[in-house]
From Swiss-Prot:
Organism: Xenopus tropicalis
UniProt function note: Has a complex stabilizing activity in the assembly of the mitochondrial F1-F0 complex.
Gene: atpaf1
Name used for this protein in its record: ATP synthase mitochondrial F1 complex assembly factor 1
Gene Ontology biological process: mitochondrial proton-transporting ATP synthase complex assembly
Compartments (UniProt record): Mitochondrion inner membrane
First and last residues of the transit peptide: 1-46
Entry annotated with the keyword Ubl conjugation: no
PANTHER family assigned to the protein according to its UniProt record, in alphabetical order: ATP SYNTHASE MITOCHONDRIAL F1 COMPLEX ASSEMBLY FACTOR 1, CHAPERONE ATP11
GO cellular component: mitochondrial inner membrane
Length: 303
């Protein structure tokens, strides 16, 4: 798709808007020169950012509870702008961040969410893969969660790649553009944190989504169980599903181009082009499908 950049919020790196100008798709992994020309030269005031209101409570909580830390992190914003977009300290705080700040829901994410805290493993260990899959589906089908039963071989590829490339930048389509999230693997958990949170709160930025993977049945049954916890003040189930689908796209696809982008983000950040993430998302159809689903959900609510 030929595209032109629509300048929003004076070039803020956490939000990018793209307007279609034609019907032809971009080649897979190719970003037009217009997209590369996207300007980030002027930094907006924090409260001018279109997503600031969404995270205001978290930021204000940090300001109230630890004002010196808040001021110090604001001072670092200029330094952060000079670093490659691929740079992130997520690996250092993904496991501890919820303990420091907690989530907006008030109860925080679960700590040490093991498989036996969800299901009685002893009761299902003798069942076959199809039976376990059906039990998992029935358990989560009425819950506000994203869940899956992943083929063992597929997860093995994702897991092997996650060990060498534990973080990546994901784009969540919005009506006005894209909201970016950094995903960071911590063991078999995958934490997602909004880029604007990282830029403003640093290592105190809380996650908005965690995907939990359970490989207990991978060897014997050939399946890996997955579920999630969502901070529903910031993300809905459709948002979380879109991010989870992108994990399969970038970590689980056979194509070298998609995982090559993940490798650049982790090991060659100076070569990483964040608009290539949008290009792959549009080429795969995930972005369009997500926006269509969001539109249908809004129509259903109006009826």
């Amino acid at each position: 798709m030929a595209a032109a950049v629509v300048q929003m919020s004076m070039g803020y790196r956490g939000l990018l808007a793209v307007r279609n100008r034609g019907t032809g798709p971009l080649a897979l992994g190719v970003v037009s020169s217009q997209l590369r020309a996207f300007s980030v030269r002027k930094e907006p005031e924090l409260d001018e950012n279109p997503y600031y209101g969404k995270y205001r409570d978290k930021i204000q909580q940090l300001r109230r509870t630890n004002p010196s830390a808040f001021d110090a992190r604001l001072d670092k914003r200029k330094e952060l702008k000079q670093q490659p977009l691929g740079y992130s300290k997520q690996a250092e705080f993904a496991k501890t961040v919820e303990e420091k700040v907690g989530t907006a829901s008030g109860k925080g994410f679960s700590k040490n969410k093991t498989l036996d805290s969800i299901l009685n493993i002893e009761l299902i260990k003798d069942k076959d893969a199809d039976e376990i899959r059906e039990i998992w589906k029935q358990y989560f089908s009425l819950r506000n969660s994203v869940y899956a039963v992943i083929p063992g071989e597929s997860f093995e590829l994702i897991w092997r790649r996650a060990k060498t490339c534990p973080s990546f930048l994901y784009a969540l389509p919005r009506k006005e553009g894209y909201e970016f999230f950094v995903g960071q693997w911590s063991g078999s958990e995958l934490h997602f944190t909004a880029l604007i949170n990282i830029q403003t709160a640093g290592d105190a930025a809380p996650s908005q989504l965690i995907l939990y993977h359970y490989p207990e049945f991978q060897k014997d049954k050939g399946i890996v169980l997955m579920t999630s916890e969502i901070d529903t003040k910031f993300l809905n189930v459709q948002d979380a599903q879109c991010l989870a689908n992108q994990v399969q796209l970038f970590y689980g696809s056979d194509g070298a181009e998609t995982f090559g982008l993940v490798e650049k983000f982790n090991h060659k950040s100076d070569e990483f082009k964040y608009m290539a993430v949008v290009s792959f998302l549009e080429q795969s159809g995930l972005g369009k499908s997500f926006l269509n689903e969001q539109g249908h959900n809004k129509e259903d609510k109006l009826e």
